[in-house]
Curated annotation (Swiss-Prot):
Subunit composition and interactions: Tetramer of two alpha and two beta subunits.
Family annotation (PROSITE patterns): B5 (PS51483), FDX_ACB (PS51447), TRBD (PS50886)
PANTHER family: PHENYLALANINE--TRNA LIGASE BETA SUBUNIT (PTHR10947:SF0), PHENYLALANYL-TRNA SYNTHETASE BETA CHAIN AND LEUCINE-RICH REPEAT-CONTAINING PROTEIN 47 (PTHR10947)
One Pfam entry name: FDX-ACB
EC identifiers of the protein: 6.1.1.20
GO molecular-function terms, A-Z: ATP binding; magnesium ion binding; phenylalanine-tRNA ligase activity; tRNA binding
Binding site for Mg(2+): D454, D460, E463, E464
One GO location term (cellular component): phenylalanine-tRNA ligase complex
Protein name: Phenylalanine--tRNA ligase beta subunit
FDX-ACB domain residues: 701-794
Gene encoding the protein: pheT
Necessary cofactors: Mg(2+)
Top EC class for this record: ligase
Length: 795
């Protein structure tokens, strides 16, 4: 939110400079993002009046003027602005004036005519970007007055970040309340005198959705001049808040919005048929908005309608049909309290974000509407004329927010703050904040003010007391606690250790959103139902991820589109799997996943360009599994996964339980995702691996190891891992190593079979093995393979 410092000081004016004020606001929890002067640095510019205005004899686009600046004579000034005319009060830079950019005004001749100054536009004074013409001042602007003084340009715009819980500070009144409390000053509110009804005109108002709209006020104002100019003082206040002046009616409602934080809307009364009905939209109902776009409404969208059609989206945006235009003479002013839940998410659904919806979503003071209506009525009549009818108030007390009594205990206050604040100070702070306070023994009973939706529980009151007391005033004290050194189980494998290993292997860690595109996720996990968000950031981020692959593959595409073809990335994070047996019907699993693509090695003059394959990723994965001490218990089994290539993928099993997948991305998926070349992925359920096997020390044999190689022929569908596992079971104490070093298919091996060449390493820790023992062990191994897999020794 952006506002004028001088406007704030009209409400409360502490004796501190701008920098101190900004720091004070920040320390109060309203972070100041910036403080900027409202105008450039200049001097020598005064209010003047164009007494004469004639066409320049030598230039079609210039005019020769005589300007009264309050001196002993009129100044001759040449001006090229299209709006220059006789009788206009203007901003005049006299000779010797210095404008922003160190531009000095001197006497000169323009196309043969003398010019003793300059008539200035807003842009030339550094006030705004408007350079369409010279500044037009009110007819009563005092001639000769310094323009900085007249327009109050010695001012700053202060921009603050208002957190969602402090919706009360989305108006000058809310910020002023905080500044008043912090400086122990009274709040000087503008006098708002009720405007009595001078006509009896009303419109019938019916509220059919009291839960969504507990309070609705309407008032007819007839005979207004919508073309009346908005006063310069109001335009300037709006401009300094970042709001562009549109017309007097809209400017008045915007002014009340910025001043009091209450959104308002004006309807063209003559376009309303029958009366006002506040209801939920009908399914499929449409509304043409003020910006000309057509919105298709849902049944949960609140609308303001007449007896035939929707006129506006309640609390969000007005409709084109009932909007105020140049022909409008009679208006209906609307001022309402809409429930935050009835507005939240509705604007985003239609791609909208308005000042009104921003405030209603966070909560508007439910007792503010009468004050805002009277303020807007008075301003509208003062500027546009007209006569006001009575205020029609439709209020459902049962659905208005209720203010609960909150108990603040002395023990809780001292414990959370860590400092004792005197009872009378606590009481004073709460009352200055607007709370109704009843003191008790070692406690306070407080009722929060209507504008503070965020004060609901005891901790909220503690926060408010500490904030107003001043965090800087709470002394630093050492923590009074005993620190117990924690122990670390040797069996716990740190995920950080695994990340370090992957980093050493050239992988980079990434963090992707848990919110993913449901369409892309369905490509990776077809037929699996994901958890959908009720209020997503965007349609492309509306589902919770079922695996980390969705985000990782999107990251690969992002990098490939930026000429990064060799990618090695990994991520650890939660996946969200629907599970009726889990709490709330959703299971959260910690996963570790990775992706590689491109060349095996970085580009090098002495290395051939080789693309990564299944065994590159499998090898990296085995290094990770080796850290767990369970690599020998892990099996890679051929198992279908719709996201992976059926012939180049595997499921990973640990002790018979599946813990993940590894493989090449399915060619069809690769095409749909626009992946460039072969891409390989893996994913592991980390919690099933985190409890590692503690290494056991064993004696290193001093006796020679013996290697024997065998080649066995088995059916094509027999996994090599099963063959190796069976070999390890034979001669457990003597077979210290089993490795597959060749796979052969072709001449000499029947079709549908393969030859596996296996090396057996045999060794004993107490003696040198005899040849007979070695041969017996090898024979035993061959026999076991023959019995289980119908294997035969290859000739």
């Amino acid at each position: 939110m952006k506002f004028s410092e001088l406007w704030l000081r009209e409400w409360v004016n502490p004796a501190i400079d701008s920098d101190t004020l900004a720091n004070q606001i920040t320390m109060a929890g309203l972070e100041v993002d910036g403080v900027e002067p409202v105008a450039g640095s200049f001097h020598g510019v005064v209010v003047g009046e164009v007494v004469e205005c004639a066409q320049h004899p030598n230039a079609d686009k210039l005019r020769v003027t005589k300007v009264n600046v309050g001196g002993d004579r009129l100044l001759d000034i040449v001006c090229g602005a299209p709006n220059c005319r006789q009788g206009l009060r203007v901003a005049v830079a006299t000779i010797g004036a210095v404008l922003p950019g160190d531009f000095k005004i001197k006497a000169a001749k323009l196309r043969g005519e003398p010019s003793e100054g300059m008539l200035c536009s807003f842009s030339e004074l550094g006030i705004s970007d408007d350079h369409s013409g010279i500044i037009e001042l009110p007819a009563d602007a005092p001639i000769g007055t310094d323009i900085r003084e007249y327009l109050k340009l010695d001012d700053n715009t202060i921009e603050i970040s208002v957190t969602p819980n402090r919706a009360d500070c989305l108006g000058i009144i809310g910020v002023a309340r905080d500044v008043a409390v912090l400086n122990q000053l009274p709040l000087v509110e503008p006098e708002i005198v009720p405007v009595g009804a001078t006509i009896d005109d009303t419109l019938p108002i019916t509220v059919e959705a009291p839960e969504a709209c507990p309070r609705y006020l309407g008032r007819v104002v007839k005979g207004i001049n919508v073309k009346a100019p908005t006063p310069l003082w109001m335009k300037e206040k709006l401009r300094r808040c970042g709001i562009r002046s549109i017309d007097a009616v809209v400017d008045v409602t915007n002014y009340v919005l910025l001043e009091l934080g209450q959104p308002m809307h004006a309807f063209d009364k003559d376009r309303i048929e029958g009366g006002i009905v506040v209801r939920m939209a009908k399914e499929g109902e449409t509304l043409v908005l003020l910006d000309g776009t057509e919105a298709k409404l849902n049944a949960d969208t609140l609308v303001i309608a007449d007896h035939n059609k929707a006129l506006a989206m309640g609390g969000i945006f007005g409709g084109e049909h009932s909007g105020v235009n140049d022909e409008t003479q009679n208006v209906l002013l609307e001022c309402a309290f809409f429930s935050p839940l009835s507005i939240t998410g509705r604007a985003r659904r239609h791609g909208l974000h308005t000042d009104a919806s921003h405030r209603y979503e966070r909560g508007v003071d439910p007792v503010l509407q009468h004050k805002a209506m009277e303020r807007a009525t008075r301003l509208l009549i003062d500027i546009c004329g007209g006569e006001a009818g009575p205020v029609i108030d439709i209020t459902n007390e049962a659905t208005l927010p209720k203010r609960a009594t909150i108990t603040l205990r002395r023990s809780k206050l001292d414990r959370l703050i860590g400092h004792h604040i005197a009872d009378e100070q606590v009481t004073d702070i709460l009352r200055r904040l607007g709370c109704e306070v009843t003191e008790g023994k070692d406690e306070w009973q407080a009722v929060a003010p209507s504008w503070r939706f965020d004060m609901e529980i005891e901790e909220d009151l503690v926060e408010e007391v500490a904030r107003v007391y001043g965090y800087n005033n709470i002394p630093d004290e050492p923590v009074q606690a005993s620190l117990i050194m924690g122990t670390h189980r040797e069996a716990d494998l740190s995920l950080k250790r695994v990340k370090t290993l992957l980093n050493d292997k050239g992988y980079q860690e990434v963090i992707t959103y848990s919110f993913v595109d449901p369409k892309v996720q369905q490509m990776i996990h077809p037929g699996v139902e994901a958890l959908l968000l009720a209020s997503p950031i965007s349609v492309e981020m509306s589902a919770m991820r079922l695996s980390l692959w969705t985000g990782l593959l999107a990251t690969v595409v992002y990098n490939q589109n930026r000429q990064q073809n060799r990618v090695r990335i990994f991520e650890s994070g939660l996946r969200f799997v629907p599970d009726t047996q889990a709490p709330l019907g959703i299971r959260q699993d910690l996963m570790l996943a990775g992706v590689i693509c491109g060349n095996r090695y970085e580009e090098h003059w002495n290395l051939a360009k080789e693309t990564v394959d299944f065994y590159d990723l499998k090898g990296d994965l085995e290094s990770v599994l080796d850290l767990t001490g369970k690599l020998n218990e892990v099996e890679f089994r051929a198992e279908a996964n719709p996201a992976l290539h059926p012939g180049q993928s595997a499921a990973i099993y640990l002790k018979g339980e599946r813990i993940g997948f590894v493989g090449v991305v399915h060619p069809e998926l690769e095409r749909k995702l626009d992946l460039n070349g072969r891409t390989l992925v893996f994913e592991l359920e980390w919690n099933k691996l985190a409890d590692r096997v503690v290494p056991q020390a064993r004696e290193i044999s001093r006796f020679p190891a013996n290697r024997r190689d065998i080649a066995v022929v088995v059916a094509e569908n027999v996994p090599a891992a099963d063959i190796l596992s069976e070999c390890k079971k034979v001669g457990v104490n003597q077979v210290v190593g089993v490795n597959l070093f060749d796979v052969y298919r072709g001449k000499g091996v029947a079709e549908g079979y393969k030859s596996l060449a296996i090396s057996l390493i045999l060794q004993d820790t107490s003696r040198t093995l005899e040849e007979e023992e070695i041969a017996a062990t090898v024979a035993k191994c061959v026999e076991a393979l023959k019995e289980r897999f119908q294997a035969s020794l290859r000739d």
